[in-house]
C-alpha cells in the first residue's frame, strides 16, 4: 500500500528582494547530501496548510511570515513504491535574520533568483520551480 504525504515549502523573500535558501543537514537528511533548499516540511493533519507553513518557518528559522503566502506550484515526489509526497510550494515575505535549527539546517543564504539559478547543489524540486520561471 502506498502512503500519501503532503509537504509545504516556501520561497521566503526578505526586504531586499532576496530569497532564503537553507543547507539541509546531511545527518538528518542523508538522501539530499547537504543540498540547498527552501524552508518547509510535512503537514500535521488537522491544521491548515498555511498554519503548517508558518509553523515550519518558525521551527526552522525563528522567522515569521509577514505577507499572505501565495501558492505557486504543486509537485509530485514519488521516491519509491511505498511513498507519494505532494509538495505545495508558496512564496511569502519575511523580515529579519534567521536563527537556524542546526539539526535541520547547517547554513543559510539570501540570494536573488538569478543567483539561485546558478547554484549547482540545489534541491531538484527548487531547481524545477526556478527553471520553469514560476518565481521571479
Which role fits each region the language model picked out?
Residues 12-13, 21, 92, 110:
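Conserved hydrophobic "DFG−1" position in protein kinase catalytic cores
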Residues 125-136:
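Charged phosphate-binding loop/patch that engages nucleotide di/tri-phosphates or the phosphate backbone
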Residues 23, 71-76:
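Generic short beta-strand segments
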Residues 1-20, 74:
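Conserved N-terminal beta-strand and adjoining loop/helix that marks the start
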Residues 8-10, 71, 90-92:
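A structural signal for short, well-ordered beta-strand segments
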Residues 3-5, 33, 38, 66, ...:
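Short connector loops at helix/strand junctions that flank enzyme active sites
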Residues 42-67, 76-125:
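Unchanged
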Residues 18-59:
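Conserved Nudix-box catalytic region and its N-terminal flanking loop in Nudix hydrolases
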